[in-house]
Amino acid sequence: VSMENGARNGEKLRAGVLSMARDGAERGLVESAFLDWLEDECRVGFPWSMIDKITPHPSERVQEELGRLGVADMAIARTNTGTLIAPFVNAEITEYLVLEDAFPNGRPALEGAGVYLTDRTTVEKAEKMKVGTCLNPLHTALAVYGCLLGYTSIAAEMGDADLKALVEHIAAESLPVVEDPGIL
């Protein structure tokens, strides 16, 4: 299952896996029977997914908490391009995973963990709603203008009446053109 947050991610994962397997077959590293098995969609599934879980830059608060718990070597570093990196990932609590229920060999009870299992069309609608209309454009607008105004978090930006009004206006213009996926 691809957790890459992009359109048709299962299709892209399948293409990548098959490309590597075909290359392996051409080199004599993979038997043709394995390649046939891998290409059989009745045997191997590459379901599409849409995940929504914001993972901001590494938090010093999370780093300190990990240190208190005895977890070593959790230093936050800055790359040559200015990106903050760390051996841990902190994330917002809110999360959504919409997953195409396309598992030809069965699957665990993912719905018990809050996963939305549905058909491919609904996954695609949810992805378009998030990426193209209801979340990413709003977040991007806040990020750009917030940075220009000196803010360091989306939460702080939402406390600014002008930025909040901007986001509400963008949302009001966007919502009429989005197709409700029927979930979320």
Q: At which residue positions do the language-model features occur?
A:
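Substrate/ligand-engaging "lid" and interaction regions
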Residues: V1-L184
